[in-house]
């Protein structure tokens, strides 16, 4: 999955019954750090001191699933800046014969002709702000804006096939592949 917070990654997973195949940094954070409240709205309690533990658990789960040859959905933004690419970190662990797909949940919110124009990004941010307000656990909008900026400059590795969450047939093919894995 790819996209800033509130772009629909977790909703996509739930709507398609992929929870049993999913690893999520946020779910690990909730188990370790709990929930806090911001103006009466629940937020995932982000504790910088536990982030190394969150990622240790995340990668242990990922490595175990890969060793067991299980299809795995990663419910994280999978975006970063300053030359770090979380997808490359994941690819280092994936067996060579695996095909890695990324479902981009942010692309459908952008203008297809000029996706990173100010108008397109502002429109997408309005949608993200509304979704963020309506979701179970909100995220500070400054963080969402930062991840939107990361998306603009983010490069997907060549080995990865990117599918828009709006491309229903391709997305369904991937979902079927995961759900029908034997």
Residue spans of the language-model regions?
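The conserved Walker
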Residues: 4-5
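Glycine-rich phosphate-binding loop used to anchor ATP phosphates in small-molecule kinases
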Residues: 49-105
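Alpha-helical scaffold elements adjacent to nucleotide-binding pockets in ATP/GTP-utilizing enzyme cores
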Residues: 86-90, 123-131, 174-177
